[in-house]
Amino acid sequence: MKIIQEIPERNIIKLIPENLDDLWHLSNIIQPYNAIYAVTERRTEDKGDKLRADRGTKRRVFLGIKAEKINFHEDFNRLRVSGKIIHAPDDIPIGSYHTIDIEPLLQVSVQKNWKKWDLARLKDAEDSSKKPKVVVVIMDDSEADIFLVREFGIKELASIKSGISKKLDYKQNEQAKFSYYSDIINSISEYEGKILFAGPGFGKNNIQNYISEKHKDLAPNVVIESANHTGKSGLSEILKSGIIDKIYGEARISKETQIIEKLLEEISKKGLAAYGIESVSNAMNYSAIDTLLLTDEYLRRNRRTIEELMNNVENINGNILIISTEHDAGKQLKALGGISALLRFPIE
């Protein structure tokens, strides 16, 4: 995320989302009644062509709308914000409806009553754009699963079978092995930065040797770690371990996974944790909340009613973490009601 300009006297921040992660951050920042300004396409009717059967022509115009609906479309790489027009050229009626499609590299101005957690989220997005992509290959001698670890979830890039079999002779298995390695390399070659290989057995070590010999340019970026499982279970193991943070710097999804693990541990021993709105609100009455945990879904559904609680947490110097339901940690928090807290001290 690029922050272009801040205009405090008007509560406006001009910014440019640079990737899908930034759009996801924006989907959690923009809320109903916020004003959004951007260059967008609007179909307008030509004054001299009212008898034509078509719906007019599209042209690019600078519009402002008051947000009513905010929809993040991962598959289409865009964030759609719909609402009534509040600023437009003279020939476009104020009060009519419009949808602004926010895509990477589109400059957007957001006008709202900025909260501390909104600004913290913008800072997170700005910092994360400077970090390399996190690519993890979980593999053994039979199969490799390749994942892109994003701010809001996991994308499986490829699942590759080795073709190695006891039914094949040595030469055929060697050919299958090198073809397997080549397919893996082709799937990760477009990503810059470190590539983490992990899994049980020696498959990860063997491909490291292959890369050192055949792809010397990639060799310095290869990191090898052990994991007891393959597939998504192996990835979950890596996320919980904190290894990704050591390699790439703090990754949001890794941080979220670890903090939910801590929450579940505290709940299991009836320790420093509260979950569900009633229990969390009670903890706030004692100023006991250290970290308030919310799923992005819960916040979007309940933002107007939950803001007082969030403000109170900030007033006692507590932390607020919004967790995506696109990955396992967020789904675990959702199962707890979508809202939980880690506490400073136990309460009855």
From Swiss-Prot:
Q: Which co-factors does it depend on?
A: a divalent metal cation
Gene Ontology molecular function terms on file: endonuclease activity; metal ion binding
A GO cellular component annotation here is: cytoplasm
Q: Which SMART domains match?
A: eRF1_1
- What are the entry keywords? Cytoplasm, Endonuclease, Hydrolase, Metal-binding, Nuclease
Listed InterPro entries: eFR1_2_sf (IPR042226), eRF1_1_Pelota (IPR005140), eRF1_2 (IPR005141), eRF1_3 (IPR005142), Pelota/DOM34_N (IPR038069), Pelota_arc (IPR023521), Ribosomal_eL30-like_sf (IPR029064), Transl-rel_pelota (IPR004405)
Enumerate the Gene3D superfamilies for this protein. 3.30.1330.30, eRF1 domain 2, Pelota, domain A
One Pfam family it belongs to: eRF1_3
Q: Which cell locations does it reside in?
A: Cytoplasm
What is this enzyme's class at the first EC digit?
Answer: hydrolase
Biological process GO terms, please? nonfunctional rRNA decay; nuclear-transcribed mRNA catabolic process, no-go decay; nuclear-transcribed mRNA catabolic process, non-stop decay; ribosome disassembly; RNA surveillance
In short, the EC number is 3.1.-.-
Read off the domain note: The N-terminal domain has the RNA-binding Sm fold. It harbors the endoribonuclease activity.
Q: Which family does it belong to?
A: Belongs to the eukaryotic release factor 1 family. Pelota subfamily.
Indicate the quaternary assembly: Monomer.
Q: What does this protein do?
A: May function in recognizing stalled ribosomes, interact with stem-loop structures in stalled mRNA molecules, and effect endonucleolytic cleavage of the mRNA. May play a role in the release non-functional ribosomes and degradation of damaged mRNAs. Has endoribonuclease activity.
Protein name (Swiss-Prot/TrEMBL): Protein pelota homolog
Q: Which organism is it from?
A: Methanococcus maripaludis (strain C6 / ATCC BAA-1332)
Q: Gene name?
A: pelA
